[in-house]
């Protein structure tokens, strides 16, 4: 059985949508 995952790029972190290191 194969499972397909759908990815939605709608996650924004910080001010620019990029993952910031160290600070949350």
Swiss-Prot record:
Keywords: Chromosome, Developmental protein, Differentiation, DNA condensation, DNA-binding, Nucleosome core, Nucleus, Spermatogenesis. GO terms for biological process: cell differentiation; chromosome condensation; spermatogenesis. The keyword Cytoplasm does not apply. Residues 1-24 are annotated as: Disordered. Testis. GO terms for molecular function: DNA binding. It is found in: Nucleus; Chromosome. The keyword Signal does not apply. GO terms for cellular component: nucleosome; nucleus. Protamines substitute for histones in the chromatin of sperm during the haploid phase of spermatogenesis. They compact sperm DNA into a highly condensed, stable and inactive complex. This is Sperm protamine P3. It comes from Octopus vulgaris.
């Amino acid at each position: 059985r194969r499972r397909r995952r759908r990815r939605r790029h709608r996650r924004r972190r910080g001010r620019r949508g990029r993952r910031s290191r160290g600070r949350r």
